[in-house]
Amino acid sequence: MKVITLTGYKAHELGIFSHNHRGITYIKKAFEQQILALIEEGVEWFLISGQLGVELWAAEVVIKLKQTHPHIQLAVLTPFLEQESQWQEASRKKYHDILEAADFVDSITKRPYEGPAQLRLKNEYLVQKSDGLLVLYDEDKPGSPSYYLEVAKKRQQQEPYDIRLITPHDLEWIAQEDEMNDSVDIDNL
């Protein structure tokens, strides 16, 4: 595997409405663990569509890891032009920072938003262009990642395609580990 698509829920689907929500830390840690494992397996490119939430947080992880793994690359393949036009200013700034740090940026349809067909095309395109999918997903709460998974599972039926899930259980484990580390630090003061 050389290319992996990173995705998951939009921030609002997770009930996250602030850029400093503690849950983002756990999501980033989970992605960092998985991305490091993927780098060890030979993955060089990480793809996102740039949607708010998990994709941008995962992109921040890739950008951070480029400091110690300079051979990895980030591509942002947006479903349409100006997808950030309706976002809040803080989100637009974070998005533009990621675009600046990315190694490749392009729009799949090269047109402004016209309809949901562009989003379906984005899912199909990113799955087609990658060797696997790393997705934050809860089977009890399908949400937007289910569209990626549907396309990925179809591809998996025809040829090898790696699908890796980060689950709520994984995040819970990271949060518990973090709390244990915090309590250990307090005890050592």
Curated annotation (Swiss-Prot):
Similarity annotation: Belongs to the UPF0398 family.
Classification via InterPro entries: YspA
Protein name per Swiss-Prot or TrEMBL: UPF0398 protein BH1768
